């Protein structure tokens, strides 16, 4: 946990960091992908305070499976901050390339039924979906699921850069330290950015910073989710809360005593780190020079 004074200092440091890097690399402003979640809310707010609202452009890129509540939260945040924004559905692009053929059509099915169906597939196609995701292993149907959700972030990345380069802006990312260490991001998707201002902050610390920055309560109370597959939350993938996960990650990083933690959860975090490190390190895989 960060003390109140440290949170304020961190906020000011990040505002200065964004402003300095934008100028150092000759960018004219910043583009941020806004999802309606806490990470993008914090980053958008930081960019506005660093650069002014006239030099920040927000892009909201929902698709068929996106939460309507999150979409509204994203729009409300942009309007509250007074930034220029564009809302563009990527459903037509995903449909055109055949992504939705990997998943049954929703038509008029209630969201609750879709979520139950997804959870059933999540639990039956793999004994440990998150680890299998990091290892790129599993039955064919599971691998199709990986392709299904990863393409969404990669399409978003292309559109973010399209909007940024038209303006001479930087793409500012929203990945936090917990996501980075555990591999909860899409390679060449949401990790492909120019500046990552919150990658040193664990998820629980991002929440503390969000409170300092007056991020709307509705966003703070929402269960963190990648909003890529209906019904799947971050904590469901990890099999533990962010509070537990961050506490274990911090202790491992500082080589502190773990005897008061659940041994099974500690072992799980270690496994996640083992595979996520390889995921990060092997970008791209190259031929070793002799």
From Swiss-Prot:
GO molecular function, one term: ATP binding
EC number, as in UniProt: 6.3.1.5
GO BP: NAD biosynthetic process
Keywords for this protein: ATP-binding, Ligase, Magnesium, Metal-binding, NAD, Nucleotide-binding
Gene3D superfamilies: HUPs
Pathway(s) where this gene product acts: Cofactor biosynthesis; NAD(+) biosynthesis; NAD(+) from deamido-NAD(+) (ammonia route): step 1/1
Keyword Transmembrane included in the entry's annotation: no
UniProt keyword Metal-binding present: yes
Transmembrane segments: none
Binding residues for Mg(2+): 39, 179
Cellular component per GO, a single term: cytoplasm
Swiss-Prot/TrEMBL catalytic activity: deamido-NAD(+) + NH4(+) + ATP = AMP + diphosphate + NAD(+) + H(+)
UniProt: deamido-NAD(+) binding residues: 154, 187, 194
Residues the record lists as binding ATP: 33-40, 174, 203, 225
Classification via CDD domains: NAD_synthase (cd00553)
Quaternary data: Homodimer.
Family recorded in the similarity comment: Belongs to the NAD synthetase family.
HAMAP family membership: NadE_ammonia_dep
NCBIfam families from the UniProt entry: nadE
Function: Catalyzes the ATP-dependent amidation of deamido-NAD to form NAD. Uses ammonia as a nitrogen source.
Record's protein name: NH(3)-dependent NAD(+) synthetase
């Amino acid at each position: 946990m960060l003390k109140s004074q440290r949170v304020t200092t961190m906020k000011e440091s990040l505002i200065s960091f964004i402003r300095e890097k934008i100028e150092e690399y000759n960018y004219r402003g910043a583009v941020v992908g806004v999802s309606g979640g806490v990470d993008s809310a914090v980053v958008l707010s930081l960019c506005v305070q660093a650069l002014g609202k006239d030099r920040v452009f927000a892009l909201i890129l929902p698709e068929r499976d996106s939460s309507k509540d999150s979409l509204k939260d994203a729009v409300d945040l942009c309007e509250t901050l007074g930034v220029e924004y564009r809302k563009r559905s990527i459903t037509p692009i995903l449909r055109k390339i055949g992504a939705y053929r990997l998943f049954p059509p929703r038509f008029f099915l209630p969201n609750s039924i879709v979520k139950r169906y997804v959870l059933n597939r999540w639990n039956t196609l793999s004994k440990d979906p998150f680890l299998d995701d990091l290892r790129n292993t599993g039955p064919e149907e599971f691998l199709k699921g990986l392709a299904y959700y990863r393409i969404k972030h990669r399409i978003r990345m292309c559109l973010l850069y399209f909007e940024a380069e038209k303006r001479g802006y930087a793409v500012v990312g929203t990945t936090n330290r917990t996501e980075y260490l555990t591999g909860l991001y899409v390679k060449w998707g949401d990790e492909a950015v120019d500046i990552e201002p919150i990658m040193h902050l664990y998820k629980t610390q991002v929440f503390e910073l969000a409170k300092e920055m007056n991020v709307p309560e509705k966003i703070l109370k929402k269960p963190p989710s990648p909003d890529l597959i209906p019904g799947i939350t971050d904590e469901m993938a990890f099999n533990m809360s962010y509070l537990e996960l961050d506490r274990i990650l911090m202790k491992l990083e500082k080589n502190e005593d773990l005897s008061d933690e659940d041994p099974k959860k500690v072992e799980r975090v270690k496994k996640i780190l083992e595979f996520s490190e390889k995921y990060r390190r092997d970008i791209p895989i190259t031929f070793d020079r002799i």
